[in-house]
């Protein structure tokens, strides 16, 4: 169980599909991915097939603006993995998060 409404989940998924590749994936992680925790911003982890940093930045910004318009002005953090970069936050987000797409 996660601490987002069905509407918020649906809007995250619909908005994500507008800005990222069909093969890309998104996870919710952090406190909102744990039903026992309280508060917290919406932490999203994305794995994308975009290879160009400018494309990643444009997709991220478009996604963030459209998502805030859809669900309201909430604190949303987005971590994106592209190319072959792998960091600890990527591993934690994927292991402890809940895949939405």
Which role fits each region the language model picked out?
Residues 1-27, 33-39, 48-101:
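Catalytic core of pol beta-like nucleotidyltransferases
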Residues 43-45:
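Short, well-ordered beta-strand segments
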